[in-house]
Curated annotation (Swiss-Prot):
Gene Ontology terms: biological process: photorespiration; reductive pentose-phosphate cycle
Modified residues (N6-carboxylysine): K201
Annotated site location: Transition state stabilizer: K334
Positions with a binding annotation for Mg(2+): K201, D203, E204
Protein task: RuBisCO catalyzes two reactions: the carboxylation of D-ribulose 1,5-bisphosphate, the primary event in carbon dioxide fixation, as well as the oxidative fragmentation of the pentose substrate in the photorespiration process. Both reactions occur simultaneously and in competition at the same active site.
Name under which the protein is recorded: Ribulose bisphosphate carboxylase large chain
Gene (name only): rbcL
Keyword set includes Electron transport: no
Residues at which substrate binds: N123, T173, K177, R295, H327, S379
Molecular function, one GO term: monooxygenase activity
Complexes and interactors: Heterohexadecamer of 8 large chains and 8 small chains; disulfide-linked. The disulfide link is formed within the large subunit homodimers.
Amino acid sequence: MSPKTETKASVGFKAGVKDYRLTYYTPEYQTKDTDILAAFRVTPQPGVPPEEAGAAVAAESSTGTWTTVWTDGLTSLDRYKGRCYDIEPVPGEESQFIAYVAYPLDLFEEGSVTNLFTSIVGNVFGFKALRALRLEDLRIPPAYSKTFQGPPHGIQVERDKLNKYGRPLLGCTIKPKLGLSAKNYGRAVYECLRGGLDFTKDDENVNSQPFMRWRDRFVFCAEAIYKAQAETGEIKGHYLNATAGTCEEMMKRAVFARELGVPIVMHDYLTGGFTANTSLAHYCRDNGLLLHIHRAMHAVIDRQRIHGMHFRVLAKALRMSGGDHIHAGTVVGKLEGERDVTLGFVDLLRDDFIEKDRSRGIYFTQDWVSMPGVLPVASGGIHVWHMPALTEIFGDDSVLQFGGGTLGHPWGNAPGAVANRVALEACVQARNEGRDLAREGNEVIREASKWSPELAAACEVWKEIKFEFEAIDVL
């Protein structure tokens, strides 16, 4: 036995298993400005005290393991360990608790969402002592957020590039999402942009399939953009999905988009991965491309109330990793999204400084310092009758995206785009005149439809369409 081993044993090392709370539950701890703070919804197994469950989360997501190890003596555990510093019961829920955990900054690689998530939402989510575990929120300190580039450009730079101010931007996802040839796809893009939309979009699962290879789609969409710009005098864009099976292929597609001179590309950031997304965001900033982000797969992670991760955490991660737009629900459409919760993470995407507000699900005050903001995209089951509510809920700094609500118009794609543009302009004008869109919205749309036959036809088609289901993710 070496002298060092004997010394280790002599100062108190004892093999075996001990309660996590003896080391990782520290209610006396005063959090530091540089700590990353996490709020976990913890559901312990029967018989497991909440303090032990919270301490287990802190341990397993930082320096701990299931047994005492002698190599703990070779480092300063107090410097590097996560600490569960507070636990509170969830009102109205049996055996559920919010455990607050503080992590020292040195645990995480600079500028890496991948490394951050590998620790905080890694193996701990399979821990047997917990029936369920959900990460509700993270506080990212400026000392860490400043190690990230963030969005390639941000809201103000995008508006300057597009020369569009004072209203939400309008988009449309091309449908059917799969099966069109590249030429017919480009035709649909042209018709929608000519009709008055600012953007059209690849659906998230349009990559490079046998019926439409990516290079052909990019070329026909670029042709559509330039033709629509020449006819309307407005800057137009199409979200060309660069998502691919490898990072190298993804970058090849982004490079080709830049060579075509188009303004924006797209990435599926959860299925593509944070490493790929951050790489693409860096390329987009360096080469003047806007970056639209789709959140495909998010509901697998965030929809269950007691297990997984809330979308507000995914939204913060995206702002750090990089994206100029991200889908954020609609409140009024076909996809999940309760109003106060949605507006909470919309503010986390757009604003520089967001105060703690538990009524909106915001557990921590978040200071983004100078990191650019991200435009929230409202998309999914929306049509012209939703325009007043969307304008009132999301405000000017947003993208309102109507897929079926454009391409489903009885007269075709261009009239569908006209209907949406007329409805939007009417709502913005009414709001600027001081009218209450929440109360008078339907009347605003009816008035505009009297002089726009395209809008009148759209109003007739979708007058009975509603998606009246209760949201699952509520406070």
